[in-house]
Amino acid sequence: MLDKFNPQLIEDQLYLESEPFFKAALKSSATPYAIMMPPPNVTGSLHLGHALTYTLQDILIRFKRATGFDALWQPGTDHAGIATQLVVERQLNEQNQTRHDLGRDAFLEKVWQWKEYSGNAIVAQQRRLRISADWDRSRFTMDEGLSKAVVEVFVKLYKENLIYRDKRLVNWDPKLLTAVSDIEVVIKDEKKPFWHIRYPLADNPNQHVIIATTRPETMFGDTAVAVHPEDERYQEFIGKYILQPITGRKIPIIADEYCDMEKGTGAVKITPAHDFNDYEIGNRHNLERLNILDDHAHLNEAVPQQYQGLYYLKARKMVVADLEEQGFIDKIEEMIGASHYGERSGIEVQPYLTDQWYVNAKALAKPAIDAVKSGDICFVPKHWENTYFEWLNNIQPWCISRQIWWGHQIPTWFGPDGEIFVEKTEEEAYAVARTQLGSDVVLRRETDVLDTWFSSALWPFTTLGWPDQTAELKRYYPTDTLVTGFDIIFFWVARMIMMGMHFMKAVPFKTVYIHALVRDEKGQKMSKSKGNVIDPLILMDKYGSDVLRFTLAALAAPGRDIKLGESRVEGYRNFCTKIWNAARFLEMNECQFDAEFFPSTNAHPIDQWMTAHILELKRTTINHLNEYRFDLAAQGLYQSFWYIFCDQYLEALKTLLLSDHATTTKKVAMWALFEYLSLLHPIMPSITSHLAKYFKMHECLTNYKLCTKNTQLEQTQTDILWRLIDEVRSLKGLLNISGGLMLQACLVTPEGEFDAYKDVLKSMARFSSLGAWNSDCPPDGFYLPCVVGGFTLFVCFDEALDKASAKNILQQKQEALEKEILHLDKKLQNQAYKNAKPEQWQEDYELLELKKSESQKLSNFFKFF
């Protein structure tokens, strides 16, 4: 073996050798288990959120394979409509071209070329994590099969009256000239002016209602002013009219409970065509929707001529100046308010009234709600169900059209008078048009494409071959587990459930595991502007994929964000080193693996104890992974390997290898190492596979099946051994004595009992001699006792220090402990502290109990002075 573990030297070759075992076995008799990988954008680059979700999914897939399931992990990529189009458009801009210069077909050809040569970089980065997806089954949301399925779904939903065309408000990006989804909008809190504007009453222009707004240019789209029906200030005005400043247009004063009497002046300008809340109020009161912007966010012909054609920000300045000049400004305040920016364009998006295609999401939501309420789908952690229900119970029509070119072009054709024909093909559309209109007409194809989330919502069944009834679809649908982040519960998870329930009449998955957000070590969200982004590719270059994977798994506590700094990763790099060094130690001591060997009651008691511990560790690890407690599984394996196997068992091994049990002990040690490797493999596939192959344990751990056994093995006295050793070390520490100093000791025990452990105790506790003693009183000299489970070990300190010095040391430590106890006791009696910080209070309480126990232990020593 190499002196040090070098992941760069082994990972690539091991991964290639393992790939044949990543495939699902369609004709297997094993129980199927399936995970659909959330498809990353083809424009994407691997970030820590990706690394976390892929690591957790891979742990599940490898674990299920190892426990006998036929595991399918379906990979693929998303065409990422707007993002991909922008990448190619930027390339064209560098050549002083636009997509319009090329035309739609030529531009799309360019995009496909880009996708072919550059669009799969994210897949190569995924593979750097050594994840075991069934790569040969990889799908793309715009490949031929999925495109066919998307058309099928759109046409069916339209003919079921669940898709329709409507003029509604959308998030409009004036730079990209398309509607965008809420998730593509970045909300920033910014300081902005809050203009208080006087709106004169129509029947008494000397009286006015003051309206506060941050967007005075939209006043030309006002079609009402609203007040709360219980606001006493405005009772006399409800039902009257006011005059819009500058234009003098009459608009009504209405009552609506949406108005907040405590905010601003309590009176709100209602602009249904340019504000989402106003749009709903307008619907309730049947108000006109007056659009005053064009698609570039310039004011249109619906406003006074002097403002027409002005960009909205320039128009805002001009409107404010005119309002001030005409005496309509009451005052100007500064406030902190939310501004909405396009994630990709960087400019402010506008609520904009435009014709779009919509899904009647409310009709699809009820079965999706029922699926979770009934327990057919479970969220882990469970509290995320509340978020899911909140969104679906308040669901709005889903805008599925985008005004771009890259994507699934909507299968709709328009007739000469606006007739709509939704069919799977152009030929079918013309045939239906000919039948309905009675003559041949020229149809115009809809230019809009579908929202990327539309095709993604079909991912669990279209990737398995739907609408064809394939063997894969029958075997692997419904899938089992979805692993994803909380931010797309609505945008993706809920929509997959809606579509699965509608088209498959069954849930798309049984469990939704929502993982945490990866933050920096201070708990702050990572962002380029803060300069605190950690690149997983750089971490893997430096430490290897196993270290990053194990770090993420160990920190993946449910419901708690991950605080990640490079120091954490370095710490788990040491764990890899520990595994490597343990394996080298066994090799140096000529331990060899025997595939037919299983430890028995004939083995040394310490070997039996190690065996029993591993069998219990295997059971708990399997339980943790079945319950999605990746953190407990990883931490349990870490603690066990480092402290039980290395610090205890391998240290004892140095003595056992000199005993009559040496041959069996070597086999037990290698059996134990293999069991650790097989349990660690789902989390750390590279180092475990390498060592298993090197020691001829198993050709490929990816194909190894975990199994559990029940056996009665000795454990009790071995536990006492470790506790005695710990007590000796602790006592040396109390007296400020070097742990390596050799001392004399004697053990009070019946003759013959504990003999199997004495050599190990002598070696690991650093005794120059270990005799037998048959009295509860120590021999002559300066002895202090270590008492564990009915066994008393007297340790002689004559060679280390005199009694007076030892007593003085212990008294000083006792006094310091008493001060800590008094301080903690006083702190815990503060009821306000307990109420304000219950978790911290509990930690302090447990610390107090520990300190009291330490104090009692010290007190017991004084009787020996």
Protein language model regions, located:
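Conserved phosphate-binding loops in nucleotide/dinucleotide-binding enzymes
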Residues: K188, I270-A273, L313, Q350, ...
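Acidic, turn-prone loop/beta-hairpin segments
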Residues: D78, P174, V180-V186, F414, ...
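Core structural elements
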Residues: Y117-A121, Q126, N574-E587, D607-E616, ...
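C-terminal low-complexity, glycine/proline- and small-hydrophobic-enriched intrinsically disordered tails
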Residues: E570, K693-F865
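N-terminal, positively charged nucleic-acid-binding surface of large information/translation enzymes
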Residues: M1-E230, I254, T271-R284, E288-Q306, ...
